[in-house]
């Protein structure tokens, strides 16, 4: 008898742990959709205030998100309707996990549109739920008839739609997503992790449409290290979610830093605009190269189909540049790589 192995779930034993790339010193990191620098780089007075937060934060007390003022800042900056309630997560990953747990009844199903964010499928498996995968079209657009057919056939309790999509960068047509929301038999999560780089959002619908959850994160706009995601939805969903979320899942430093950052959202928007301009510039340069298929992007990365994804990945790595190799992760991503938009200097390297 093995006292450890014998008590661990068999389905977990065959899972693979999420691998974070080991980054040697001096590498240009274009693999994880992070911003290329501190969001307040160059603003010395703000950096000084930022540093003082650590001294002032009441780290001897448990955090109380509702009393921190973060909800009010989120509503003001992102236009979250008063009808919607807000939940915070230790990154969007935690919200995905608990939203999945919320509907994990026997025989319940999760529907995902793939290729997309791997944590949707992972959490469905973690809670013993059947995962219904609907492939995208070959140009990474939404196959709406297939999605509607899958909804009718499988009656999923939970549907995840990344808007814009990761890892493709393509944003589906809004009217198609609206049709999915109307057709759904359960909860629809519109994951807007990359919404800051797109011109459209479903946040105005949060609280108005009972079965809709709109999820966002501050990771992609310069604060990946704070690990804060947020969701907005109707009270009928959020009241139930509140029962299972850990009571102190956000730490005092993250709450204080996030609130401070949102007060200076104009600077954050300037950083976003700079990255969007760089995205256009890099896209135009890639389109000049032969034998590449460059997909349109509404995120802070560009997905490209190349003749030899493995060879390109290794060549760039030898030159101390790290990108994400998508090849092998899904049939539609054959010979694809994903390139995060960095600074102008990083992009020109």
Q: Which role does the model predict for each range below?
A:
Residues 1-65, 73, 155:
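N-terminal "arm"/small-domain region of PLP-dependent enzymes with the aminotransferase-like
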Residues 58-183, 194-209:
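Conserved core of the PLP fold type I
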Residues 211-288, 293-294:
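PLP-dependent aminotransferase class I/II
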Residues 232, 303-305, 340-342:
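Short hydrophobic/aromatic beta-strand micro-patches
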Residues 275-276, 288-319:
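Conserved PLP-binding catalytic core of the aspartate aminotransferase-like
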